[in-house]
Each structure stands twice: as structure tokens, then as C-alpha cells.
From Swiss-Prot:
Sequence ranges on the Cytoplasmic membrane side: 271-525
Name the UniProt record assigns to this protein: Erythropoietin receptor
Family affiliation: Belongs to the type I cytokine receptor family. Type 1 subfamily.
Annotated region described as Disordered, given as residue ranges: 434-459, 492-513
Keywords tagged on the record: Cell membrane, Disulfide bond, Glycoprotein, Membrane, Receptor, Signal, Transmembrane, Transmembrane helix
Disulfide bond listed as a keyword: yes
Localization in the cell: Cell membrane
Domain Fibronectin type-III as annotated: residue spans: 146-246
Gene: epor
Length: 525
């Protein structure tokens, strides 16, 4: 029983030896065949690698593997060798059909021979475009996988697209994330592709200046730093996002449309019911303009002028009185000759007769004087003659005949002819003054005084007139029209010595409708 059992044990032991040898060969020569190393994948990698990188092409995807390949003629004696620290090693090649006459020769380095930051010398045969031997560094031939978890979000404040991703995964814990840079492609339908490069270490980008459209975004990466370098990876799967219109712009547009609509409705309502709304919102304030026509336009608010009770003569507009100044009263003083007459010698009243002594000195308002004379011919003459009789008893005027006036003074009779060339004969110390009404103006009289040469000066008086202003208008204070003055006194031109004194200056502020009347001429010794 013992012999057969030992025989079976020895037979089973020898059957497991080939499997152990195969496993040892795999560990010593390399890893198992990579199923991704298809002819299509190798063609894609060869097209991706730039031309400056010569054959054979080598790369590492996760810093844990290293693969070299090239395209050459079909040979059974093809070989690939690499050396590190002057120790040459031969790689077991794997072939894939490239075309009708060429094969892909593939060498996969064992994991134990993948050494970073150390130079490796490689040589391949047959390879017409390959150097006999060249030195490479695995950490400079990195071919990364595309970035992971690419996301695109639309932001409104500020408006734009936020694109983010994660770096590719590595089997070994290598600090390479800070040495990977990225490229982002984005485009809209009908527009050219735009590429933005992101600096190493950043894993997001914010795109501004976007428009409402559908955006397609892709991302790729590349090792580009001090320690690692390599090739651009494949682009990620495209991500499409449709952006909407800017909410702020939409809000502003909505507000503008709403305001325009409200304005249109308001204009329509105002055009249709404007007067009604005006009376409702702003009631009409009562104004006297409707009841006082012309008071505030023609008469400038002067109520007296509007009633017709003010003077209709010259109105003086002061340039120095403003509308905001309060109303004031102005008094004007003027010096006038006295109204006293010498005593009359004739107790009898004078008759109302006159003669024109000088035809060249006619009254300015003869028609008005004639009309007034007919109205008050009796009353005026009697009152004036009676005053002359009571005031002066030394001078008497008598009518001698038609066209003549006799003046009797100091028992001497002087005849005034109708011819103006003969003149009048009076004594130098005698004079006749046309009487003036006492109530015509206010007077401030003064007594007779003696002049510097010893002669007695003529008594004089001061007249003042009150003037009132109303909105810049200055006019004399209104007075009633004085009674008629006998016309004959306006023509008395008497002189005994031939010397005539100049007439007094005209008073422009005298409220009299006969301001153009010739003032009496006085004769004094």
C-alpha cells in the first residue's frame, strides 16, 4: 500500500513543474499581454506623438508601466535591447499586423525595470528610421489619460461658464498633479473652436463673454513641469450645455417694456381725460382776472388807472424802483412867486373883458379856454375881481372902450391899447400879477426879506406835491381841475422901465390841464 501511494505523489509533483516554470518566466520577463495594445491603438498613439520623437516610440501611462513600439518589415530575427548601468537586457517582442508588409513590434518593460529619473539606452532591429542607440528617461515620456469628472455650470453673477475637472488617476502615489497643465476647447454651432490653456495645478476655469447658445466643451491634459514631461492626452468626451439669456438683461428689458407700456397708457389717458384729471388733482384757484379785465395786463395792476380815477398825464417810470421794494410817498418842493397882489384903488369889480396885446403869444389851448370861459364867465370874473378889489385897493383896472383896458394906480390912469406894438406904461415900483387860486397847491410862505444890495426881495413861497408809486410808476398826486383863470391876465405884459425879468421856470409836477400856459411876467424895480 505504501509503494503505490508514493508513486502517485511523485507523478502529481512532476505535473506541476511546468506551471511553476511558466509563472517564473512571466515574472522574470514582464507582465501579461495588455489587451489594449491593438493595431488601432498603436496607430493612434503613433499619430499623437510629435515627429521630433524618433522611433521607437516609448511612453508610460501611470508611471508604473513602460512600452516601446515601432513599425518595421516582417522579420523573424527582430530584436530590442535596453541597458541600465551597463547591463544589457533583451526584451521579448510581441507583434501586431500593421499593414500588408509591416508589423508592429511591441516591447513591454517588466515592472521591476521601470525606473524613474534614470537614463536608459535602447536599440531596435530592424528599424530604418531608428538610431543605433539612444538614451531616454521614463519620467519625460508620460502619456496621461484624459481628465476625470468634467462638469460645466452656468453662472449668473457674474455671468459665465464654470468648467471643472479632476486630474487623471495614478496607481502610484506620485506628486504630479501640480505639474499637469490642461487645455479646454469650447465652441458654439456655426462658430470656430476656441482653445484656452490652463496653468499647471489649476483644475477649473471660468469662461466669460458667453452668449445664449449651446456650448460644447472638451478637456485634455499633459505633464509639463520640472520633473515630468510628456505628450497631450486624448480629449474628454464632449459635454454640451445650453445657456440662457442673461437674467439681468432680461430684467432690464422687461422693465423697459413695462415702463414704455405704462408711459403709453398714461399719455393716452392724459390726452383723453387730461382736463378732468387736472381739475381733480389741481383745483382751479379763483383769480380776479375774469372779473377785472385789463387790470393785470393793460394797467399792470394799477387799480386807480383801471378805475379811471388817476391822472391821465405823464407817468414817470422810475428805473431805480424795483417790484420788491415797498410803496413809498415822495414829496417834491418847488419855489413859486407869491400870489399876493398890490391893493386896488378901484373899489368897483373889473369886467370880464380882455384884449390881445401880442398876437404872436397866443394861448396854447384856446379852444379849451374858450369853452371854460363860456361855462364860468360870470362866476370866475366876479370872484377874481372881488379878490383883486379886496387885496389891492391901489390898482384898479377898468374897461374904457372896446379893445382897451384902463389901469389906475396912484391917481394915474394908463391905457392899454389893443395894438401890441405900443406896449404898457407903468411905474417901476408898480406891478400887476395875474391872480392865482389859493387852493391850487400847498404853499409854505415866507416873509419879505432884504437882499444883499439893500433892496427888498420879492416874497416867495414853496409848493410841494405828493407823488405815489405803484409797481414802478411815478405820477403826481391827483387833484381836481382848478377853476378857470381869466384869460385877460395871461396877456398882461406890463412894464414901466423897459426891464423885464425872465419868467419863472416851468413846474413839470403841477397838476393842471393848462401846464403849457404862459406864466405871468413880473416887472420889479
Amino acid at each position: 500500500m505504501g509503494a503505490p501511494s508514493s508513486l502517485l505523489f511523485s507523478t502529481a509533483h512532476w505535473r506541476t513543474v511546468p506551471f511553476l516554470l511558466a509563472f517564473w518566466v512571466l515574472l522574470s520577463t514582464g507582465t501579461a499581454e495588455d489587451p489594449t495594445m491593438t493595431p488601432e491603438f498603436l496607430r493612434h498613439i503613433s499619430e499623437k506623438i510629435p515627429e521630433e520623437y524618433q522611433n521607437p516610440h516609448c511612453f508610460t501611462r501611470d508611471l508604473n508601466d513602460f512600452i516601446c513600439f515601432w513599425e518595421g518589415e516582417r522579420r523573424k530575427n527582430a530584436s530590442f535591447s535596453y541597458s541600465e548601468d551597463d547591463q544589457i537586457k533583451w526584451c521579448q517582442l510581441r507583434t501586431e499586423v500593421a499593414s500588408n508588409n509591416t508589423w508592429w513590434y511591441i516591447c513591454e518593460f517588466p515592472v521591476t525595470d521601470v525606473v524613474l529619473f534614470a537614463g536608459i539606452t535602447i536599440s531596435a532591429y530592424p528599424c530604418h528610421k531608428c538610431q543605433t542607440a539612444r538614451e531616454i528617461y521614463i519620467n519625460e515620456l508620460v502619456l496621461l489619460n484624459p481628465p476625470l469628472n468634467v462638469t460645466v455650470k452656468e453662472k449668473q453673477d457674474p455671468r459665465g461658464l464654470l468648467i471643472s475637472w479632476k486630474p487623471p488617476h495614478f496607481q502610484k502615489n506620485h506628486d504630479i498633479n501640480n505639474e499637469i497643465k490642461y487645455q479646454v476647447n469650447y465652441s458654439t454651432p456655426g462658430a470656430d473652436m476656441q482653445t484656452v490653456e490652463v496653468e499647471a495645478g489649476n483644475t477649473e476655469i471660468f469662461l466669460t463673454d458667453i452668449v445664449p447658445a449651446a456650448y460644447t466643451v472638451t478637456v485634455r491634459c499633459k505633464a509639463d513641469g520640472v520633473s515630468y514631461n510628456g505628450y497631450w492626452s486624448d480629449w474628454t468626451a464632449p459635454i454640451t450645455i445650453a445657456t440662457i439669456i442673461d437674467l439681468r438683461l432680461l430684467l432690464l428689458l422687461s422693465i423697459a417694456i413695462f415702463v414704455a407700456l405704462i408711459a403709453g397708457v398714461g399719455v393716452y389717458i392724459f390726452m383723453r381725460h387730461g382736463m378732468y384729471l387736472k381739475h381733480k388733482v389741481w383745483p382751479q384757484v379763483p383769480t380776479p382776472e375774469n372779473n377785472f379785465q385789463g387790470l393785470f395786463t393793460t394797467h399792470k395792476g394799477n387799480f386807480k388807472l383801471w378805475l379811471g380815477q388817476a391822472d391821465a398825464y405823464l407817468l414817470w417810470i422810475s428805473r431805480h424802483v424795483f417790484q420788491e421794494d415797498p410803496s413809498s410817498t415822495l414829496e417834491v418842493l418847488s419855489e413859486l412867486p407869491p400870489a399876493a397882489l398890490p391893493q386896488s384903488f378901484n373899489p368897483n369889480p373889473l369886467k370880464d373883458s380882455y384884449v390881445v396885446l401880442d398876437e404872436n403869444r397866443m394861448p396854447c389851448s384856446l379852444e379849451w379856454l374858450e369853452a371854460q370861459r363860456h361855462k364860468t364867465v360870470i362866476v370866475g370874473a366876479e370872484s377874481m375881481d372881488s379878490r383883486l378889489q379886496t387885496v389891492n385897493k391901489d390898482v384898479v383896472l377898468e374897461d374904457t372902450s372896446k379893445g382897451q383896458i384902463a389901469v389906475k394906480a396912484n391917481n394915474r390912469v394908463h391905457s392899454l391899447e389893443g395894438d401890441g406894438s405900443q406896449g404898457e406904461a407903468f411905474r417901476e415900483d408898480e406891478y400887476v400879477e395875474a391872480p392865482r387860486m389859493e387852493h391850487e397847491r400847498h404853499r409854505v410862505s415866507r416873509e419879505n426879506s432884504v437882499s444883499s444890495d439893500g433892496k427888498q426881495s420879492i416874497p416867495s413861497s414853496f409848493e410841494y406835491t405828493e407823488l405815489q408809486t405803484c409797481e414802478g410808476l411815478l405820477s403826481p398826486k391827483p387833484r381836481p381841475v382848478p377853476p378857470r383863470m381869466p384869460l385877460k391876465y395871461a396877456y398882461l405884459d406890463m412894464s414901466s422901465s423897459g426891464e423885464h425879468s425872465p419868467p419863472p421856470s416851468p413846474n413839470f409836477y403841477q397838476n393842471s390841464p393848462i401846464t403849457n400856459f404862459l406864466a405871468p411876467i413880473y416887472s420889479q424895480s
